Amino acid sequence: MIGIAAHICAAAPGPGARRYDPNMTPEERSHIDNGIWLCASCSVLIDRDQERFSVEVLRQMRRDHEASCRLGDNGSEAEGDLVAIGSDIVAVGHILGSGPAGMRVRLSHFVEGASRDLLALVHEFDRQLPEKRYILMNELGYGGLLDGAPNVERMGSAYEVQFRLQQTAPRRDATAEAVGMCAETGRMISGMDAYIQNFERALGMARGTWFARIRDGSDLSDLYWRYKDSPWFKRLAMMEMIRLSSIPSIKKCAHGPSTPFACVNRVNRVEVPTFELEGQRLNLRVEFDIEGLGPWSGELSVFISTPEQLAKGRASARIHHENIQRIEAESRNDLL
């Protein structure tokens, strides 16, 4: 079944805006609590019959469904876990097999994106940015860059995807000396304390807010505001950590490709004790497989930017980035 996201209360007034509530704030209209995932036929049906499908009826449908198949409480093969293919496709699926020809996964329904996005990625693979040609699998706790365009086959209401991964990026041995300066105290830190601070910084730097590497960064803040209080959040947060631990940074490094998390081989577990922020920080409990150390568990305190900070930071970074590109282009022209 292919899922389509629909609004319980319309996002804006106007012709065809079903169940619009003028008392809702813009944040409430765009919040995950105002969304419901349906099949293509039902999504059209509820938009045509607001008398039969009232706000309360739709909210009760959503509560009943979440109670019956809550992610994390149901480990059945039918439900599966999250799989991301590139930056625009997230689906629920599970691994069918792995061998010399590569791996094969079955996608049961889409959380973000749709079947047309999956097929477009296959046919336009060479036009995709290199850093977006990846696959992430929560079931295994890791991912990697695709070695070529995946093969996609429709199997009833599901899609089966076969792919090969490139050689994994080297990980840094966490037992080797690592030092840094504590952002809070200014004191020198080393070992896992330095790596933990690196994890927190990588997760807290929102994508598109640093002008020097505008395509780098984390999506955790965006995910927090979109999926706050939802059982989907911890799975999507885990997927984001898998991306940061498996996909090399865009930046060029003298020592070769390196991932933002540097020393993490696998992300085995992520828990969200509470969605409440303390000083704009979200506490997360994680279990990683660390190069040189093996299994490691600990807590991370990650800065979460507000929607206003994200918009302002991205606008400022974009201006600086464009100015730098303009200056560099002018310098090249002067040399000709």
PLM segments and residue spans:
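Immediate N-terminus of the mature polypeptide
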Residues: 81-231, 256-336
